[in-house]
Amino acid sequence: VTGLQTFTQQPLVDVVDLGVSSGSQPILEHISLQVAPGDLIGIVGPSGAGKTTLLRAIAGTIRPQAGSVRLSPDLRVGYVPQVETVNWNFPTTVNECVLMARTSRRFAWPTKVEKALVASVLARLELDGLADRHIRELSGGQQQRVFIARALLRSPDLLLLDEPTSGVDVALRHELLHLLAELRSDGMSVVLTTHDLNGVATHLPTLACLNRTIIACGETSSVLTPEILELTYGASMEVLEHGGMRLIVDSPEHTHPGFAHSVRPLVEENQR
């Protein structure tokens, strides 16, 4: 099962028949994907599917063995890798960490314009109250937002996020999804990877299901089907509806008995 999006605008990113290997072991094969202005695309798939590798190929940090990644001229790309808790030995404040995006030096003397830009970005991500805190004192979720703020300081046209909701609580996850929707409305394109099907993927407008190659790509409602999920994850899954929301479970027998009576498989619903 494959599906590619059709755009009326010139894409910012055009991935054509991409292949990436580690030695003789293929990581990605025959990947074709386009990203248009204002796109918000989630990449889902099992561990080892190549999600991070695809982001790195788009960011230009690895060289593919086959195919190509074409970027529009003068495209500004922000890339935030998956963040583990930072334990830096040197004392760096949140303000200084974000400022690195403009100065490329840890303790450079900022201009008034740069100070204003940092303050604006920190406020947008609700980090202004933490500006003078050492980054190593923050939680993992707070640190993740700091690195997103640093990427936004460069005013990217395309933002690449690797597992941005990993290790964050429900409230921070909702805040991040709201921020991504705002960035999209501002015209920024966002591509992110996630393992969280129910908490993140179901809330995104577009999904690409990846397992070494793209199994399917398109509107979330058309991609999140039991057939495509099984091809992607190699396991039987059900897509259920509850209270107007889509829920994905491994299999019906794993569903709580009381909950099972209150949900309807979307496949059956669509056949009525």
What does each model-identified segment do?
Residues 134-138, 142:
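Conserved ABC ATPase signature
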Residues 159-163:
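Catalytic Walker B motif of ABC-type/P-loop ATPase nucleotide-binding domains
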